[in-house]
Amino acid sequence: MTISFPKSSHPTGLHFFTRNPHPKKEDHGDCGVRALSLATDTEYRFVKHYADDAIAQRHDGDQPVWGYKRLQTSYGGITRQEITTTLNDMAKSDRKLYDWIYVSYKTVFHKDNLPEICIADQDNHVVCVKDGAIYDSWDSRGKTKKLKKVIGVWCHRDMWQKFMDKHNRDLRTAGVVK
């Protein structure tokens, strides 16, 4: 179901809604878990469980100088590979997540450059984008007219196809990428 909002006055064309699915409303480096939870409509604790497992498997305590707690939980951040692993692991028990993919493409953070429902990878932050609005615990759209860079998105394969069809399957000609 697509929700339509009035035109946004922000340079990104996106609206902002404060949403923090963390049970205690804490905000401490768990942007990947928040974005996954909000974009996939999956309960935060389930996403966190799978994310922590992906992080533990990837690091396996190989870098003790970073600190034990940071490496063992998603509160210390999560990499692109760990987000993809988390989605793949979640898909084993939730079929609707099976066709989520990561698409790498360089663009700017603007409504017209993103699929309707996706997780935008802003290099040092990931954020849930749904129907022309971002959903996060803080406003990551930026405070200046210069648009932030996006280096890729996670989205359902059907959303990506719809996005590509909207731009006649040529993102360069459509001005989405340069």
Residue ranges of predicted features:
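N-terminal hydrophobic targeting segments
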Residues: 1, 111, 117, 121, ...
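Intrinsically disordered, low-complexity regions enriched in Ser/Pro/Gly/Gln/His and often acidic
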Residues: 10, 59, 91-93, 147, ...
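Short, flexible coil/linker elements and helix-boundary hinge sites characteristic
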Residues: 41, 94-95, 110, 168-177
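Noncatalytic regulatory segments and standalone regulatory/sensor domains
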Residues: 136-178
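Active-site nucleophile-adjacent alpha helix/oxyanion-hole segment immediately C-terminal to the catalytic cysteine
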Residues: 1-75, 80-81, 175-178
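Low-complexity, intrinsically disordered short peptide segments enriched in small/polar/basic residues
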Residues: 2, 14, 131, 147-150, ...
